[in-house]
Amino acid sequence: MARLHSGKRGSSGSTRPLRTEVPEWVSMSAEDIEAKIVEMAKDGKQSAIIGNILRDMYGVPSVKLVTGKSVSSIMKEAGFYTEVPEDLFNLMKKAINLRNHLENNPRDTHSTVGLKLIESKIRRLVKYYRGTKVLPAKWRYSPDTARLLVE
């Protein structure tokens, strides 16, 4: 798939093998995995990072295959999932860091263009999440509220 804000082609990636049952080499049970997810969520880790840690350190190829639930749904049940979705939160963090950079370097025009692209992507995501009722209908993005949410 092509990149959003450039004329370049995207890079191809590998696909995960199609599995319907848990591999026999997975040593952790579903309860152990859920406890580990809750423990890492208490430490403040995001669901994508938790999934990578479980894959790389504990040998769990797919949490959903073992437990029947995704990492984010396990975090929601335990009460550790944020009210703002993670992809939107990460984009807001990126926009705030870029704004801080532009305060110190106001003539950096390339970063100014990058900030506009990031914020347009944030607005598109907010529109999507408002339509799917993940965010309230009155929720608006502004750099000041984003700074308060992230910090």
Swiss-Prot record:
Keywords: Ribonucleoprotein, Ribosomal protein. It comes from the Archaea. GO terms for molecular function: small ribosomal subunit rRNA binding; structural constituent of ribosome. Pfam families: Ribosomal_S13_N, Ribosomal_S15. PROSITE patterns: RIBOSOMAL_S15. Residues 1-20 are annotated as: Disordered. One of its GO terms (cellular component) is cytosolic small ribosomal subunit. One of its GO terms (biological process) is translation. The keyword Ribosomal protein applies. The keyword Transmembrane does not apply. Part of the 30S ribosomal subunit. Belongs to the universal ribosomal protein uS15 family. NCBIfam families: PRK08561.1. This is Small ribosomal subunit protein uS15. It comes from Methanococcus maripaludis (strain C7 / ATCC BAA-1331). The gene is rps15.
